[in-house]
């Protein structure tokens, strides 16, 4: 049967408690739909038990920010009430860029793991979701994610549900869209979408990008970012690296409309800003307003033109459906929240 695990919003990422071994040691792993290897050892060391078994492989992954390398083991992994025997995990001997987490729970598409093992460079590594399904523990190969906005630096307000959706966590119905055929977004939880600002300003015409719980900001291609910056009147803030608005500009900030799978999802003005009472946590000023839309760093038309990150997903329920090769989104009771 399906099972749910609570997730903690740490402002820049979400983590879940993952048990490894028997008896289990608990690790705090970053929930990442943008990568597919599960690994630990960034903070708390790996504790070997009778269920721990080294394979003959080394494992290494390089991320958008950070990397790790180490040894592959198989071990019993527990996620809430769900148990996964013989799950592959990486045990880091070196890592960089992972403060505040023990490692990553990689729940992206399995093919992203090809090339991460050595010498078995052509072998893929089933994710926790894949194994839960193949071992018959959950009825369908699917992960559903509920994130919510936060006004504190750590809030256990999220939920991962393996094998089902949780209807108490969303409103209306779920809109599904097929995984895009455009490369390189197609290798990830990639979708096609358009973005407009307010009633009529096009920011991004129909294009491919990815939905990624492991990216904090909502990133758009550089040319689209320039249009957004101009439309909002924002200026680049050197202290935070974010766009900054005055309170007067914020009062005039329009919604961003994301059209996905024939449905339009509204990212409200409040959803576009960093939680104001946490401005100082990122080096900002308490009296300013900072935007969570950032510059992807490459122009549109390259096959990965946006990343709908954690800040987007705090406002919508998301479903990562491997069985049907599709991604689902739904509104929630937090879609129009004004807590930021």
From Swiss-Prot:
Pfam families xref list: Asp
Naturally occurring in which organism (per UniProt): Irpex lacteus (Milk-white toothed polypore)
Keyword entries, A-Z: Aspartyl protease, Glycoprotein, Hydrolase, Protease
GO molecular function: aspartic-type endopeptidase activity
Family: Belongs to the peptidase A1 family.
Gene Ontology biological process terms, A to Z: proteolysis
Entry EC no(s): 3.4.23.29
Protein name (database record): Polyporopepsin
Domain Peptidase A1: 14-330
Catalyzed reactions per annotation: Milk clotting activity, broad specificity, but fails to cleave 15-Leu-|-Tyr-16 or 16-Tyr-|-Leu-17 of insulin B chain
Disulphide connectivity of cysteines: none
